[in-house]
């Protein structure tokens, strides 16, 4: 491919030494693209930093940002990457978690979709996998709803790929965020809401592009079973989910906060609040009971 796209990959890491070699091998083996990997390591207690430094010494595509700050979570670490990396030499920008395995054509598929003019941002389904060998498709590719981005992300952030122009606008916005927002609002959810609220076209590919590792240290994990629904119910019952929604809306679309905080508005528009039908009715049930 003579006209291969150039992709900047933003990788946030923390105590990730066990899975990083496999992850980096899968990223480095991407087909028909040119790439650079920008790494921000949260203050860790294992050999994560040394692993990246050793890899960077052998691979000029790996760039490790300055080390020593305690970010306290994946989101502020990603916001640091978004704010500091220079995207001027890249066509597209992708997020990467520290412990997943990318399919070889992950970036090529994303680049093809974005170059076709059909979308401004790309994400995809993923194949979750566990240490016991179990695998499961995590389907996030339902049709978008008018307000879904205020109540959920587009899926795992490790599948997100942005056109340069979109990322530059997002970068400009992230640089203005106060510190407490960077700790409260997940980077992938904010990225999705920012883009959708500003009219950027978002494609969720039904074809999985990543093997999404599940283990005890996952920041979010899957939301695809009854255990997940129990956790979601607990978040709703304690008002934590509502606080997250309102914090997000107040950040990316403060003019909409009055509506999104209004129970009657949400009841009237419940069909627009989530992409998946069963999630819409689950949220409706929570609204009717006054739990949300």
Spans of model-derived segments:
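Nucleotide-sugar donor-binding/catalytic module of glycosyltransferases
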Residues: 1-226
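C-terminal subregions of glycosyltransferases and related glycan-biosynthesis enzymes
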Residues: 173-180, 190, 211-292
């Amino acid at each position: 491919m003579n006209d291969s796209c150039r992709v900047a990959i933003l990788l946030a890491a923390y105590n990730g030494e066990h899975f990083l070699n496999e992850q980096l091998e899968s990223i480095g083996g991407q087909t028909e693209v040119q790439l650079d990997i920008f790494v921000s390591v949260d203050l860790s207690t294992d050999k994560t930093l040394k692993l990246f430094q050793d890899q960077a010494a052998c691979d000029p595509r790996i760039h490790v940002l300055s080390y020593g700050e305690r970010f306290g979570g994946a989101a502020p670490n990603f916001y640091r990457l978004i704010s500091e990396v220079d995207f001027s030499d890249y066509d597209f920008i992708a997020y990467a978690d520290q412990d997943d395995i990318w399919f070889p054509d992950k970036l090529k598929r994303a680049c093809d979709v974005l170059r076709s003019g059909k979308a401004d941002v790309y994400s995809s389904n993923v194949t979750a996998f566990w240490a016991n060998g179990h695998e499961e498709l995590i389907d996030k590719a339902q049709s978008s709803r008018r307000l879904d981005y205020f109540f959920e992300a587009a899926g795992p952030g490790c599948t997100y790929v942005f056109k340069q122009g979109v990322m530059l606008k997002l970068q400009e916005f992230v640089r203005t965020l106060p510190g407490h927002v960077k700790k409260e609002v997940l980077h992938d959810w904010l990225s999705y809401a920012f883009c959708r609220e500003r009219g950027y076209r978002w494609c969720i590919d039904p074809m999985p592009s990543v093997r999404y590792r599940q283990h005890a240290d996952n920041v979010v994990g899957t939301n695809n079973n009854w255990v997940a629904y129990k956790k979601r119910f607990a978040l709703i019952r304690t008002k934590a989910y509502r606080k997250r929604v309102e914090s997000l809306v107040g950040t990316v679309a403060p003019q909409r906060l009055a509506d999104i905080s209004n129970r009657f508005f949400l009841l009237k528009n419940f069909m627009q609040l989530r992409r998946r039908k069963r999630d819409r009715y689950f949220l409706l049930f929570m609204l009717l009971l006054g739990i949300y």
